[in-house]
């Protein structure tokens, strides 16, 4: 894990932002981890050790939404989709838990730690790589997926890292 120490970390998801922009989406990309930030905790109870990072991420997302609503009031803010990969996916699920009224859909790309809220709104999706399992209780059961209209999509042959800078459309 090199986290934010990679000097190209701000380009990691350029393929995804380009793809979504070409499909007509207005894309806002947030670089959460800065070069002088401490690395994420790699041991302990992640729901405790990583929570400060996730909470800061949620605050960053909330601030960004509030500011862009002022800058771009003409956008359809009722159709807001939040997407995050890995740690960003954990932030996405925490944001969906805390501010469900602000987003229409939340999509995680192989997050592993933050429990997906069991709710019908916002609509929740998670794309799962083939190489790592999520922690126990993070993902909804098949019954919960049906009950809450959640979707877990397993991607055969796609690894956790393939969803980042090595990913393709």
Task: Label each PLM-derived region with a short phrase.
Residues 31, 86, 130:
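Nucleotide-sugar donor-binding loop of glycosyltransferases
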Residues 145-163:
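Catalytic histidine neighborhood in serine/cysteine hydrolases
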Residues 167-169:
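Catalytic active-site module of serine/aspartate enzymes centered on a nucleophile-bearing elbow/loop
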